[in-house]
Amino acid sequence: MIGGIGMPELIVILVIVLIIFGAGRLPELGAGLGKGIKNFRKATSELESAATGEKKPEELEEKK
């Protein structure tokens, strides 16, 4: 598969991560990665709404 990551590649990456960090730290890494993705999505949605001038329902209620 050109330009994509298939199942064999994902398995190899997972094995390498297990070797480097160990099974005990995987939950910590997963939680940190999840928080990072959540913050990234929140920041991008805030930037998009600021660029288009849209207001979120929470922002409209705060100004009342």
Swiss-Prot record:
Subcellular localization, as worded in the UniProt entry: Cell inner membrane
Record-level Gene Ontology MF annotations: protein transmembrane transporter activity
Membrane protein topology class: Single-pass membrane protein
GO cellular component entries: TAT protein transport complex
Segments traversing the membrane: 1-21
Cystines in this chain: none
Main location: membrane
InterPro entries: TatA/B/E, TatA/E
One Pfam family cited in the UniProt record for this chain: TatA_B_E
GO biological process: protein transport by the Tat complex
Keyword Cell membrane on entry: yes
Keywords: Cell inner membrane, Cell membrane, Membrane, Protein transport, Translocation, Transmembrane, Transmembrane helix, Transport
Annotated family: Belongs to the TatA/E family.
Function: Part of the twin-arginine translocation (Tat) system that transports large folded proteins containing a characteristic twin-arginine motif in their signal peptide across membranes. TatA could form the protein-conducting channel of the Tat system.
Subunit structure: The Tat system comprises two distinct complexes: a TatABC complex, containing multiple copies of TatA, TatB and TatC subunits, and a separate TatA complex, containing only TatA subunits. Substrates initially bind to the TatABC complex, which probably triggers association of the separate TatA complex to form the active translocon.
Name this polypeptide is given: Sec-independent protein translocase protein TatA
Organism (species): Syntrophobacter fumaroxidans (strain DSM 10017 / MPOB)
Taxonomic lineage from the root: Bacteria, Pseudomonadati, Thermodesulfobacteriota, Syntrophobacteria, Syntrophobacterales
